[in-house]
Regions:
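Globin-like tetrapyrrole-binding proteins
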Residues: 1-139
Length: 139
């Protein structure tokens, strides 16, 4: 049986340069790719503090992993979903698939041991959280 949680965690460490607390180009490359992917994304990030945003994404990925591992919705993810809802930042559902594809492309670039299992692990870890975020859009 394939341990996708372990595959994801090991890949995440590799893209961060070996430590989940280390800073590197992964998040810069992700946001460059994501913002360039759509005029709507660029508009949403026009006045955003990117240093803060990168820290939030780093924490969000840990929340996604937590949700995948425990099958429970972390409180932090509920708060993020509220901030991304129609009533707040108004992040529509279609941007999440774009977000995921940009994230996967960035993993491909930064993980020297990228493989089909690594990509699937990232998709599986993110899937439940994305489903939750899109569900909460109109809540």
């Amino acid at each position: 049986m394939i341990d996708f949680e372990k595959i994801f965690t090991e890949s995440y460490k590799r893209v961060l340069g070996g430590s989940m607390s280390q800073e590197n180009d992964f998040f810069d490359d992700f946001y460059d790719r994501f913002i360039a992917s759509s005029p709507l994304v660029a508009e949403k990030f026009a006045n955003v503090d990117m240093a803060f945003q990168k820290r939030m994404l780093k924490q969000s990925i840990i929340l996604l992993l937590n949700m995948f591992a425990t099958k429970r919705i972390p409180d932090g993810l509920t708060e993020i979903a509220r901030k991304h809802s129609r009533k707040a930042a108004d992040i529509p559902a279609e941007l999440y698939s774009n977000w995921l594809e940009c994230l996967i492309a960035t993993v491909r670039k930064h993980d020297p041991r990228n493989s089909n299992d690594v990509e699937l692990a990232w998709r599986m870890v993110c899937a439940q959280g994305i489903a939750f975020m899109t569900f909460m859009y109109d809540k």
